């Protein structure tokens, strides 16, 4: 396989149901749409869903059930707020030794990455598609792994070390909401260190947000993020009756224009993978992805 693609979900209760390919239900329509658009090239791409909802879903849904008979209005909105704030506050890293939720979520992500690695080689370029809170989670996961890596290097298994990370597409991403507690904001190092020059030339962190999505934000205005995020794309998503409403937050997965955007980027990476080793040019200094993390922060 020439390319590995991992998909991570965001807020909301997600069933832990998988198809014969091991894909969770939230990812199936998007993966099917990408395969249709890629045609024969789809055979060069391995997909894997990353699932973490089970860590928090049971607690949130149990509470919602307990308040069913209470005199509460706007229940659909209250449910959405509970699931988002419940996921966000439950996931936060705390110092209490007994609270391991942060580590549990990351272990679920790690398990998905390992399942993907079992299908591809250690040098395979990796693309991560991250929705909503999943963008914050995967950013933290990559950050923690990069701390373990200490210095950029090509280890025995650079894929598991996330040093073959060639693409990151965040959509409906709310990373900015988690930065305001810090005076200095530092992004992950991007792209990975172990990429061929041709793949590195095409490496991109792309951020997509629907203008009506109250949980999707531009990333480049964040301190230091313009050095690693290549594009903030405002893209209305969903059918006409949701496209200009907050409901658009859940519509990226099913939107044809978003599918086209993703497929176009995957094609560029696949084409770069066809170039001989050593082909292509390195990103010149000053372009996103070329400056060491130490220079940014």
What are the roles of these predicted feature ranges?
Residues 2-6, 80-81:
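Short coil-to-beta-strand
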Residues 1, 98, 119-123, 271-297:
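Defense-system signaling and execution modules centered on TIR/cGAS-STING-like, death/scaffold domains
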Residues 43-45, 163-164, 201-203:
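A short helix-to-beta-strand connector/capping loop
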Residues 17, 167, 173-287:
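Lipolytic serine-hydrolase domain surface
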């Amino acid at each position: 396989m020439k390319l590995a693609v991992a998909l991570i979900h965001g807020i909301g209760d997600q069933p832990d149901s998988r198809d014969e390919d091991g894909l969770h239900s939230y990812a199936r329509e998007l993966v099917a749409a990408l395969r249709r658009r890629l045609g024969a090239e789809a055979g060069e791409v391995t997909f894997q869903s990353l699932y973490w909802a089970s860590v928090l879903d049971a607690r949130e849904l149990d509470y919602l059930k307990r308040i069913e008979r209470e005199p509460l209005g706007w229940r659909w909105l209250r449910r959405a707020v509970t699931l988002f704030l419940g996921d966000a506050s439950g996931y936060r890293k705390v110092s209490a030794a007994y609270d391991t939720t942060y580590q549990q979520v990351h272990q679920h992500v790690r398990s998905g990455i390992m399942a993907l690695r079992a299908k591809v080689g250690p040098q395979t370029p990796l693309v991560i598609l991250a929705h909503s809170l999943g963008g914050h989670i995967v950013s933290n996961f990559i950050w923690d792994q990069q701390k373990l890596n200490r210095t950029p290097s090509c280890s025995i298994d650079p894929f598991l070390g996330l040093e073959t990370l060639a693409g990151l597409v965040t959509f409906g991403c709310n990373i900015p909401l988690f930065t305001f507690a810090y005076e200095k904001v530092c992004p992950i190092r991007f792209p990975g260190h172990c990429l061929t020059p041709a793949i590195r030339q095409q490496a991109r962190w792309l951020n997509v947000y629907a203008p009506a999505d109250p949980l999707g934000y531009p990333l480049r205005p964040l301190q230091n993020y313009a050095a690693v995020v290549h594009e903030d794309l405002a893209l209305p998503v969903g059918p006409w009756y949701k496209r200009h409403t907050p409901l658009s937050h859940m519509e990226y997965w099913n939107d044809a224009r978003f599918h086209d955007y993703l497929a176009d980027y995957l094609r560029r990476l696949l084409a770069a993978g066809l170039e001989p080793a050593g082909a292509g040019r390195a990103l010149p200094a000053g372009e996103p992805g070329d400056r060491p993390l130490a220079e940014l922060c």
